[in-house]
């Protein structure tokens, strides 16, 4: 087994997390699975084959993975979190593009002020900064948390042992209130036939059973909002995993990640937008070259994808070949782990902020048109302002999605989200052009191509694509 280049760093992380795990189990005083301490010992020694073997045995019995048929009560321990954090960091460091993955993590660290609360909601965005902290358990230099485990009571208990009383961690009561709030809203939508894909609700007597990724993420989101509201003296940042509706009114592009402002923003001003553009130009240039401009066409982007990603013809290419090659290995390396997928996902997330602003402007304009004629006439200046603002956001979302697609054209998220924007603007031909080249890298995108063709044949083409 090949040794990671930063092996001393990984060993040190195992050592720190073993000490934390021992402290956690001393509080729990319960029977533990036999693999825990040999796992940490193997990590400290650099015995990576044993680390992988023991982690696999524990993970197969952990509560974390749905549909686990060999569930082990002994795995219900807070020590599972240090185990998971060490293994996930080790995996990040053993990829062929691990130097770029670590560079991504280091950039996230640079962007976040000390004392902030940071939601790391992708594997790289969570586990690499966790390991790069001076002391993760002490929130030094900032508090690394994931929204995606907020509904897990064991994870919240783990956070409390580390971070209270310095920051407020949601309680079991907060979790229950979030669950009840979600159920109340979801039942109403179920009766109206408005459940979203990934929401599965079933009535079982007097109770409602919930399953599905969308439902779980919605509950996690409500709990994380409590955390935001109860920690008013801390800055918040997020590396987006799934779009989170409550964040958008507060969201501002902040380099690779998103800043969650304390107050809702009336707009994203020209200074914020220019700063975002300048930052991403500097990020993208060493990775895939300095060629994407505002006037760059979809044909030019698809030609680049065909040449560099599909044919791997690097003639005249001025970027990181390892970056682009890993984007084509989506079968072997999960897309959320590769460096190209991480940069692309972050750019898509920021494009999503602009899309939310587009829709918000549209809603404000619709609200004005619902007024009486007399009141509407008084709002003509607002209509012109909102229309101009909306066009500005459309331009930025379009450009950001083009960059996201060029960074990883095999990414379903980048392709689907951009296709949604293009079709909403009547640019189905461009969406279809993108889907046709993307499916060469990821055959799963054939479905999108079929949907786009079907929509194009309709008299009034309408398509809804969900990331």
Predicted segments with their positions:
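ER/secretory pathway lumenal C-terminal domains and tails of membrane proteins involved
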Residues: 1-121, 125-407, 413-414, 423, ...
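TPR/TPR-like alpha-solenoid repeats
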Residues: 41, 353, 421, 452-460
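Canonical tetratricopeptide repeat
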Residues: 349, 417, 451-452
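Terminal, low-structured helical/coil segments at or just beyond the last alpha-helical repeat
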Residues: 367, 371-374, 432-467
């Amino acid at each position: 087994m090949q040794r990671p280049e930063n092996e001393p760093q990984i060993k040190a992380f195992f050592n720190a997390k073993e000490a934390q795990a021992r402290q956690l189990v001393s509080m729990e005083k319960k029977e533990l699975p036999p693999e825990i301490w040999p796992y940490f010992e193997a990590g400290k020694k650099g015995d990576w084959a044993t680390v992988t073997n023991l982690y696999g045995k524990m993970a197969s019995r952990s509560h974390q993975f749905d549909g686990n048929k060999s569930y082990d009560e002994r795995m219900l321990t807070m020590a599972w979190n240090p185990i998971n954090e060490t293994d996930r960091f080790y995996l990040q460091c053993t990829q062929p593009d691990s130097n770029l993955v670590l560079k991504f993590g280091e950039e996230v660290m640079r962007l976040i002020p000390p004392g902030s609360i940071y939601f790391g909601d992708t594997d790289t965005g969570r586990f690499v900064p966790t390991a790069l902290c001076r002391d993760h358990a002490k929130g030094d230099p900032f508090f690394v948390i994931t929204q995606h485990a907020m509904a897990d009571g064991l994870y919240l208990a783990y956070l409390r042992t580390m971070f209270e009383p310095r920051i407020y961690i949601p309680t079991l009561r907060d979790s229950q209130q979030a669950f009840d709030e979600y159920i109340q809203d979801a039942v109403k939508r179920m009766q109206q036939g408005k459940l979203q894909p990934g929401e599965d609700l079933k009535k079982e007597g007097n109770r409602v059973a919930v399953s599905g990724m969308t439902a779980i993420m919605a509950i996690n989101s409500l709990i994380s909002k409590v955390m935001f509201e109860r920690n008013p003296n801390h800055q918040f940042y997020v590396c987006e995993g799934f779009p989170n509706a409550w964040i958008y009114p507060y969201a501002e592009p902040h380099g690779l990640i998103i800043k969650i402002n304390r107050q809702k923003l009336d707009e994203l001003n020209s200074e914020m937008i220019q700063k975002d553009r300048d930052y991403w130009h500097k990020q993208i240039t060493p990775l895939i070259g300095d060629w994407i401009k505002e006037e760059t066409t979809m044909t030019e982007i698809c030609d680049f994808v065909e040449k560099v990603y599909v044919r791997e013809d690097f003639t005249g290419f001025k970027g990181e070949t390892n970056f682009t090659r890993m984007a084509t290995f989506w079968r072997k390396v999960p897309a959320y782990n590769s460096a190209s997928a991480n940069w692309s996902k972050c750019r898509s997330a920021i494009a999503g902020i602009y899309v939310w602003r587009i829709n918000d402007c549209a809603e404000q304009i619709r609200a004005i048109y619902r007024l009486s004629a007399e009141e509407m006439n008084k709002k003509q200046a607002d209509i012109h302002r909102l229309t101009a603002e909306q066009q500005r956001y459309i331009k930025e979302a379009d450009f950001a999605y083009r960059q996201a697609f060029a960074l990883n054209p095999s990414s379903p998220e980048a392709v689907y989200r951009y296709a949604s924007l293009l079709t909403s603007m009547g640019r189905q031909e461009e969406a279809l052009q993108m889907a046709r080249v993307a499916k060469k890298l990821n055959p799963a995108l054939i479905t999108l191509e079929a949907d786009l063709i079907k929509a194009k044949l309709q008299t009034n083409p309408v398509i809804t694509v969900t990331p």
